[in-house]
Amino acid sequence: MQAINPIWAEVQKSLQKTLSKPSFETWIRPAKFNCFENGLLTLIAPNTFSSDWLRKNYCETIEKTAKEICGYDVKVIFKSETNINSYLTNKENLDEKKVDHKTKSFSNNSQDISSKNRSKKPNGLNLRYVFKRFVVGPNSRLAHAAALAVAESPGREFNPLFICGGVGLGKTHLMQAIGHYRVEIDPEAKVKYVSTETFTNDVISGIRRDGMTAIRDKYRNVDLILIDDIQFLEGKEYTQEEFFHTFNALHESGSQIVIASDRPPNQLSGIQERLISRFSMGMTADIQPPDLETRTAILQKKAEQERMNLPRDLIQFIAGRFTSNIRELEGAFTRAVAFASITGLPMTVQSIAPMLDPNSVGVVVTPKQVINKVSDFFKVSTDELISSSRRKPVSQARQIGMYLMRQGTDLSLPRIGDEFGGKDHTTVMYAIEQVEKKLSIDPNIASQVQKIRDLLQIDSRKNL
């Protein structure tokens, strides 16, 4: 049952008189009282998006109103109910696994297991990419089943597991879900997720520094290795040689190997036949673009996770217009929520449809067009945009450019990094995450991104 506090009740009552009805009903009323101690008022928002929005736009107003009511300074902090529930769920799952491990004599000290599981962070894994967040459809049923089988019984019949499919269809999600599952089941498991670009860079660094022994130990002393974008081994002869021996060492030791690519093994070019043969010796599972029913389910699940109440007709509208991949679909969802929050318009098909043109940044847009449009818009040179300059105007423009290139082309993170002067894929990933976060809380950023999209849309139509 929700805790009731007279001070927060009075603050809400006062804000209801001063704020517009849509603002109050959307942001203030859903916020729950958590505690009030020593002048610190803690409120719980329904989700991370709402928490960030309240912090950015209403914190000062709430503090001022609370001071008027209390007669002394009050500080306000916001927590996300989504994160709290996620923490409690994870804790509950870990507690169950502690009992299971204890029953099986894996450990006599459940507290040790719990502390190890909390402190040991899986190498390179994104916390969002877990099995329970993956929506299974006819397009991905085989890949999901194979991934789950490998997670439950690694190093057996599906070794290697080769997951293939186009950009933004969930390959990385499934790979990393395997890693998370193994670490939850066995906190001592050595799990490593790595892109082919990172593996290549490590090999090059090892050669230059005469440190190949350390590199080999790093990649061969694991229980589960997850290699993403293996197609980028193309033409890299020495890296292929090193990966061949790494593959053999892992396979012979019984370690599980999971590989992802944008195409099946027999369609990879510029890669040694002996590697192709090894890629094909286990299980190959492909992921196809999701059908309408699956796309609808994906959006419904995302809305539930974000505690957003989107009308069913709007979900069906978005699902019907964005058909290429899941990344594009979720990007449309994020833009719709951000647009409605910033403009104050209702979440209806009529209000959202004009800004959800799937052709606004389509695959006909080239990396060069994105760089040129971003450069012109922010009035920075293209050389400066792809440089390593950390000046705020330049770095912000660069982040937006990376975000738009990810949304509007079929380039992978490493390839986008190459377009921006050879940046690492982790830099690109960070940039995209930053822009996605700002789109939800910063109207200025949202406006800039939309204006550049409009400019790219004009270019796109010229090329039709």
From Swiss-Prot:
Belongs to the DnaA family. PANTHER family: CHROMOSOMAL REPLICATION INITIATOR PROTEIN DNAA. Residues 1-79 are annotated as: Domain I, interacts with DnaA modulators. GO terms for molecular function: ATP binding; ATP hydrolysis activity; DNA replication origin binding; lipid binding. Residues 99-120 are annotated as: Disordered. Residues 341-464 are annotated as: Domain IV, binds dsDNA. This is Chromosomal replication initiator protein DnaA. Residues 124-340 are annotated as: Domain III, AAA+ region. It is found in: Cytoplasm. The gene is dnaA.
